[in-house]
Curated annotation (Swiss-Prot):
EC number(s) reported in the record: 2.4.1.117
Cross-referenced InterPro entries: DPG_synthase (IPR035518), Glyco_trans_2-like (IPR001173), Nucleotide-diphossugar_trans (IPR029044)
Protein name: Dolichyl-phosphate beta-glucosyltransferase
Illness association: Polycystic kidney disease 7: A form of polycystic kidney disease, a disorder characterized by progressive formation and enlargement of cysts in both kidneys, typically leading to end-stage renal disease in adult life. Cysts also occur in other organs, particularly the liver. PKD7 inheritance is autosomal dominant.
Family: Belongs to the glycosyltransferase 2 family.
A Gene Ontology cellular-component term: endoplasmic reticulum membrane
Keyword field: Disease variant, Endoplasmic reticulum, Glycosyltransferase, Membrane, Signal-anchor, Transferase, Transmembrane, Transmembrane helix
Pathway membership, UniProt: Protein modification; protein glycosylation
Example GO BP: protein N-linked glycosylation
One GO MF term: dolichyl-phosphate beta-glucosyltransferase activity
Keyword Amino-acid biosynthesis attached: no
Lumenal side: 1-7
Encoding gene per record: ALG5
Membrane topology, Cytoplasmic segments: 29-324
């Protein structure tokens, strides 16, 4: 009996090793090059409040605002107004309290099929294009790609990415700012503060099925085991960057869709950029574009491939690249 068990164990180990080698080969051979940092001609401009074209700035220009808010939006004509109303109400009140405070909100329409750009442009007309700008992408790039386009067109010393659904209470940006400041001194002026829902985990578990809870824990384990250490919630769409940290991480990003957050933080940890994880107020909003099982499965595959592609040298981290 013992020899049979030993043989089965050896066979199992051999099959596992063969599977890992095969997956590594697939990861290496299917690895796409880093997406070209290229804008279509139409994406080099925004419309001012009068509907006239103006050239977008670059993240490699000197900052002229204290805060940039980048809002990736795909078919968000219904949910975007709630988020924009809350954000702009807060930002306007803050500016009245402190006239030295300056900001901009950049809505990036990621190839939407609805009226997202028109809805966003109404805020540009109301507040002016110095405060609200709309970038309409020619085709869908994915959430990470849309955020990158917004960040590379920003003017802020600090840059916040915030989801269009308004799930995170916008005034919590102050918590992220404090978290960022607590990380000082910043090496090479780079630091990141991540909004986190980890403190809400017990409450969310009580509302989820056992299967979804199992998927959640499995995903968290894979993130920790394969890519990012010490960050409990990598997926919250509320993150604050110094300008230098944003340019370094987003110029090195390969993944432009759902698992981009994980690669982003993997890159940050590779470059030893300090990261703070800050609890924020978060509410689940109806209309999610994720199908739970398949989205977790896809992201699990992405995590494995992210790790293997860096390990095998298919992907390499480079110095900061500029967009054409």
């Amino acid at each position: 009996m013992a020899p049979l068990l030993l043989q089965l164990a050896v066979l199992g180990a051999a099959l596992a090793a063969a599977a890992l080698v095969l997956i590594s080969i697939v990861a290496f051979t299917t690895a796409t090059k880093m997406p070209a940092l290229h804008r279509h001609e139409e994406e080099k401009f925004f419309l001012n409040a009068k509907g006239q074209k103006e050239t977008l700035p670059s993240i490699w220009d000197s900052p002229t605002k204290q805060l940039s808010v980048v809002v990736p939006s795909y078919n968000e004509e219904k949910r975007l107004p709630v988020m924009m109303d809350e954000a702009l109400s807060y930002l306007e009140k803050r500016q009245k309290r402190d006239p030295a405070f300056t900001y901009e909100v950049i809505v990036v329409d990621d190839g939407s099929k609805d009226q997202t750009s028109k809805v966003a442009f109404k805020y540009c007309q109301k507040y002016g294009s110095d405060k609200v700008r709309v970038i309409t992408l020619v085709k869908n790039r994915g959430k990470g790609g849309a955020i990158r386009m917004g960040i590379f067109s920003s003017r802020g010393e600090k840059i916040l990415m915030a989801d269009a659904d308004g799930a995170t209470k916008f005034p919590d940006v102050e918590k992220l700012e404090k978290g960022l400041n607590d990380l000082q001194p910043w090496p090479n002026q780079m630091a990141i503060a991540c909004g986190s829902r980890a403190h809400l985990e017990k409450e969310s578990i009580a509302q989820r099925s056992y299967f979804r809870t199992l998927l959640m824990y499995g995903f968290h384990f894979l993130v920790w085991f394969l890519c990012v250490k010490g960050i409990r919630d990598t997926q919250c769409g509320f993150k604050l960057f110094t300008r230098e940290a944003a340019s370094r991480t987003f110029s090195s990003l390969h993944v432009e869709r759902w698992a981009f957050d994980v690669e982003l933080l993997y890159i940050a940890q590779f470059f030893k950029i300090p990261i703070a994880e800050i609890a924020v107020n978060w509410t689940e909003i109806e209309g999610s574009k994720l199908v739970p099982f398949w989205s977790w499965l896809q992201m699990g595959k992405d995590l494995l491939f992210i790790r293997l592609r860096y390990l095998t040298g298919a992907w390499r981290l480079e110095q900061t690249r500029k967009m054409n």
